[in-house]
Structure formats: C-alpha cells, structure tokens
From Swiss-Prot:
Protein name as annotated: Lysine--tRNA ligase 1
Enzyme nomenclature, EC number: 6.1.1.6
Pfam families, per database record: tRNA-synt_2, tRNA_anti-codon
Family: Belongs to the class-II aminoacyl-tRNA synthetase family.
Example of a GO cellular component annotation carried by this entry: cytosol
Species of origin: Mycoplasmopsis pulmonis (strain UAB CTIP)
Length: 491
C-alpha cells in the first residue's frame, strides 16, 4: 500500500476485514462462478406483488439476484441492482455456516443471493436468504445514508457514485437510450441507411466552429476532430445513397455552459429529392414521434407548459428582427446596420456584413421569446455557407428549430451548385483571414464530389443531448451526459 495515501477510519476497518476474509480462505474480488441470476428487482415487483403473504409462502418461489448493499438494519438488508431495490431477510440461525462472513458485510459490498420470496408483516416483498456470497468488497464507504452525494461538481466527476446514490439519475440515461433507439426506429422505417463517417478530418467543414487538433505520426499529417458529419454524408448522396443518417460524437473546441459541452452527440440526416419544407416536416414528425413513444405530450419549463404535439410555428428571421428593432433589414446598408447594432450594444467584428448583424440581433432580441416549438427561417447567406439561396439571394433556404429559447435543430435545402459552393468557401476563407476563427475552409474533395452531381436534397442536424434535456426537463447539459467535460480538479 502507498504510505502517502491517507485512509479514513472506515477505510482502515474495511481493509482489516479483507485480512479476515483471507484468513477464512474467501476471495473478496472474484470471478463470477455461480448459477446465473434469474431476476431483477423491478421484475420481482411486477410479477409477484399481487400475491398475498400466504400465497407466497405456499408457492415457495426461488430467486437468484445480485446487487450492492445500501442499508443494513437488524436482519434486513436492502440491495440495489440495475433496475431498483429489493429487501433481503437474513435469519442467522439458518445461515450458521456463513455467520462469520455475514458479520463482515458492509454497506457498498456487492453480494450474490439465493432465496425464497416472501412478504413481511407490512406487506413488503422480501427475499429470505438461503445462501449468499460476497462478490466484491467495497473499500471506500458510500456517501452517508447512501443519498448524501449532493455536491454537483462531485456528482459529475464521480458519476458512478451519482448513479448509486441518486436512483433518478439512472432514469435520465434510460430516457437517453430510448430517445436514440426511437430516432433509429423513425429513420429505419423510412429506409434510411445508418452509416459511420470519419472523426479525423484534414479540412474543417460542415459547421462554423473551432476544432480540436491532433497529429497522425505515421502519416506525418495534422487532423481536426470533426465538427460536423455533413460533408461526408452529402458525398454519400452523390454516390447514390438517397437517404442516409449518422448518430455520432461531434467535437468543438469552444466554451462550456448549460447547453454546450465540447464533445456531444448529434443526429444528421440527408434526403435526396427533398427540400427545406420536407426537412421541417421530417423534424417535426421525428420530435412528435419520440414524444408519443415516450408517453410525453407536454413538458414544463418552470411555470410554462410546452406542447410538443401541437403544430410547430414558423417565423422569418429578418422579419422578426425588423419588427423588434422597427428597422427594415431587408432594405438596409452596412453603415445603417452597424448603427442599429450600436444601439443594442452588439459588438461588430471587422468581417461583419449585414447578415452577421441580423443574426446577432436575432440572438439578442428574439431567441429568448421562442418558447413553443418554432421554426426560424430565412437566414442570411453570410452565416449559411452550405444552404441553397432563396429567391432573394441574400437569404437562404435554412431553418432552425427553437424550443424553450434554445436551438434544437438546423436544416437546409442543400446547396448543390459546385461553382456557387466554391464562391461561398472563398468568402468563408476571407472571413477567417479577417479574424473569424469559426469560418469554414475550402474542402476540395467535397467540391470535387459536387461536380459529379449532388441531387436536390435536404439535410438536418439535431443535438441529441439538448433533446434529452428537453424531454427530461433538465436545465444543464451535464445532467444528460454521463461523463461531461470538467475542469481539472485542484488538489
């Protein structure tokens, strides 16, 4: 043992118990070599709770279960498995051969149990233990009273303890699993192909974001961790896969707050022979499908009720900003736009054009008003380098879905003109040279693919973490990511 490790009194006692187990010839960290478990705690309640005490006594139902000890009170022990808790009853007289090991058990130990199902005088389902075995010894005590882990930072840092101490946390991640499963079901039933595309990209593209950089020694080449899956997925449309989607991790080297984590999970889907209207329809149908499958029609944000099954609203970005500022942003020059931005204390970067200012004012004035599901359309071309233009070529066929003031989805009629796409990339490169670190680079391999012909298409990206936040009514993205990114702990 490292002499520099300071142990608490409880930790010392538990290590002394290890020696006692050793003296009894019992391994404390063993391989599983028993008859396999045949039930989980929640199944016990579902299958047998309707039986009376006398009926259970007559049936003599034999069960095998395993779990972590949460409490010990006299002859009663409560264990927790993956699906819940169950009470055990230990009659020391019937376990005479195991009395020494029984006395060495601690809260936090993981045990294997064979027993007979019964009900107590109070009617609580309980397993009367016929045999038990210690599978794993807990050397560090759980938080006091097994629900004392309340420090938020510590909960995220030690998620394994959070899951033990706060059973409701596990429900969040079951919901997350179900959401991803329902997304797959939605697209699989429409004959979309699920694919996997590279995480290492030599050229930035698919979004405006700062990347994480890495280096491949064998290739002597620098790479970026992907900031989106868009460009390789659109290459697959060129290749004749007309309906395609990817669920995967995205990495963006940006700030951390309640809605942003540097690595997150997204779903991007692309459909040939479609457009923005079809993408909005698909997105609305997807969210309603998930809500129905999970039995959720309405969710609450503090005192506001959000109806996920009502028709989603639509507003135009430029019209909304014009109405809020009382300035016609469809007919305005850059100098006037800068003047209006100044009124609202918007910082104007040197690469800004009118479209950038419209977007900044939208984020400042409009986003906070979007509570019910709302599609925002008509984004300026300056902030939409991959979207097709609308009839007014200053704006694009793009939409974002906002719910409860947050963006949940981003969708386009995809730009399939390789010549226009090159001009857009070149404009992005000029922005990068003027200080926009998030601007896209010129991806020659993507342009080459477009020159073979990208069919008219629509595409959409949805942040799964935020969607789970919405459906579980959580305020922070860290609550729905098992191991969120945290600052290094100061020792």
């Amino acid at each position: 043992m490292n002499d520099n490790i300071k142990l608490t009194e409880q930790e010392i006692i538990r290590r002394e118990k290890l020696k006692k187990y050793e003296s009894l010839g019992i391994k404390t960290f063993k391989k599983f070599d028993h008859e396999k478990i045949n039930i989980y705690s929640n199944e016990i309640v579902e299958k047998y709770n309707h039986f009376s005490k006398d009926e259970l006594l007559e049936k003599q139902i034999k069960l095998i279960i395993a779990g972590r000890i949460l409490t010990q009170r006299g002859p009663f022990i409560v264990i927790q498995d993956t699906n819940g808790k169950i009470q055990l009853y230990v009659d020391k007289k019937e376990l005479e051969e195991q009395k020494e090991t029984l006395a060495l058990l601690d809260i936090g130990d993981i045990i294997y149990v064979k027993g007979t199902l019964m009900k107590t005088m109070k009617g609580e389902l309980t397993i009367k233990v016929n045999f038990f075995d210690l599978l794993t010894k807990g050397l560090t005590p759980l938080a006091e009273k097994y629900h004392g882990l309340v420090d938020v930072e510590e909960r995220y840092r030690k998620r394994y303890l959070d899951l033990i101490s706060n059973p409701n946390i596990k429900e969040i991640f079951w919901t997350r699993t179900k959401v991803i499963s329902k997304i797959r079901k939605f697209f699989d039933e429409q004959n979309f192909m699920e694919v996997e595309t590279p995480m290492l990209h030599s050229i930035l593209g698919g979004a405006n974001a700062r990347p994480f950089k890495t280096y491949h020694n064998s290739l002597s080449s620098s790479f970026n961790l992907r900031i989106a899956t868009e460009l390789p997925l659109k290459k697959l449309l060129v290749g004749g896969i007309d309906r395609v989607y990817e669920i995967g991790r995205i990495f963006r080297n940006e700030g951390i707050d309640t809605t942003h984590n540097p690595e997150f999970t997204s779903i991007e889907f692309y459909q040939a022979y479609s457009n923005l209207e079809i993408m909005m329809e698909q997105t609305e149908n997807l969210i309603k499908f998930i809500a129905k499958e999970l039995g959720l029609s309405k969710i609450k944000n503090h005192d506001v009720e959000i109806d996920l099954l009502a028709d989603f609203k639509k507003i135009n970005m430029v019209d909304a900003v014009s109405e809020a500022t009382k300035v016609d942003f469809r007919n305005i020059d850059l100098d006037k736009a800068i003047e209006v931005a100044g009124r609202y204390k918007v910082k104007v970067e040197k690469y800004f054009k009118v479209g950038h200012i419209i977007n900044e004012l939208f984020e400042l004035l409009i986003e906070k008003t979007l509570i019910q599901p709302t599609f925002v359309t008509g984004h300026p071309i300056e902030i939409s380098p991959l979207a097709a233009t609308s009839e007014d070529e200053r704006f694009t066929e793009r939409a974002e879905l906002f719910i409860n003031t947050k963006e949940y989805a981003n969708m386009f009629t995809e730009l399939n003109d390789p010549l226009d796409q090159r001009r857009r990339f070149e404009a992005q490169l000029e922005e990068k040279e003027s200080g926009n670190e998030e601007a896209s680079e010129i991806d020659e391999s993507f342009l080459s693919a477009l020159e073979y012909g990208l069919p008219p298409a629509g595409g959409c990206g949805i942040g799964i973490d935020r969607l789970v936040m919405l459906l579980t009514e959580k305020e922070s993205i860290r609550e729905v990511i098992l191991f969120p990114t945290l600052k290094k702990k100061q020792v």
